[in-house]
Amino acid sequence: MKFSTLEHILIHLSFSICSIVITIRLINLVVTTILKPYDFSEKGIITTFLCLTGFLVTRWIYSGHFPLSNLYESLIFLSWSFSLIHIVAYLKKNKNLSRITASSTIFTQGFATSGLLTEINKSGILVPALQSEWLIMHVSMMILSYAALLCGSLLSAALLVITCRKKFNELLRLIESLSFDKIQYRNQRIHLFGKTYFFSVKNYYKIQLVQQLDYWSYRVISLGFIFLTMGILSGAVWANEAWGSYWSWDPKETWAFITWIIFAIYLHTRTNKNFWGANSAIVAVIGFLIIWICYFGVNLLGIGLHSYGSFKGMAS
């Protein structure tokens, strides 16, 4: 069997499994069945992880270099990183994080296997600037950081949605209470004590969910920030060897630095308990947008020292 055929089978098998997992989860939101979609989805993502690992190893052997030389390969590695985080979340029994990583895996892999990247989905000879032992260290750290930071930011976004929805519902109840006359108010008081337990339990679970989202978003973003720092530092050393300068302020480097600053601000807000929750989550959501600009948006420009990373070279 040719390497290209094996790659084709592995990548489309993993995409098909992800699609089935997402479909079952969507159906489960509407219809309750006797199946256990959570257990099935975990096994599906683990199988996807193994398929993607097989794809990366196969391409590594076939091409002779680590498969991070173009946008297509970096997207596959990003999808692999999401599935890796998903497995960690599964072992930690964190369903909230695993839901996000499963969706992220199917999104990135779906884009990678779409017709938009057909021209670069085949491995080629590395350009001279990429023929370095720093390729694995720098690009892998950057992609892992993107995966972790994106997952953490999505957890923060979920926290914001729940918090804003709660405040919106409280505002609606306040408006409704102001429109009631005295008779309606007395009738409400009769039923108030019967409903107190229901609302207290409901609010308790919401508070628990918000706290878990806040806790895990902080943990995952902290890990991503470490990877990002290592990626930037290793990239600076590599740049000095390749171009004779540690930093050149080209678009890719500039936006990577902006990304680092945004998440440094996020971590700084975590030092003050008054900024925990929604306040720090807002910074993380901003960081989510910045990451996509840094990773994908800058590549579309095709300018700067990382111009070969647009659609023909590295996409770190």
Curated annotation (Swiss-Prot):
Keyword Coiled coil on this protein? no
Bilayer topology annotation: Multi-pass membrane protein
> Got a GO cellular component term for this one?
plasma membrane
Q: Where in the cell is it found?
A: Plastid, Chloroplast thylakoid membrane
The record's Gene Ontology biological-process terms are: cytochrome complex assembly
Assembly: May interact with Ccs1.
Which protein family is named in the record?
Belongs to the CcmF/CycK/Ccl1/NrfE/CcsA family.
Task: State the protein's name.
Answer: Cytochrome c biogenesis protein CcsA
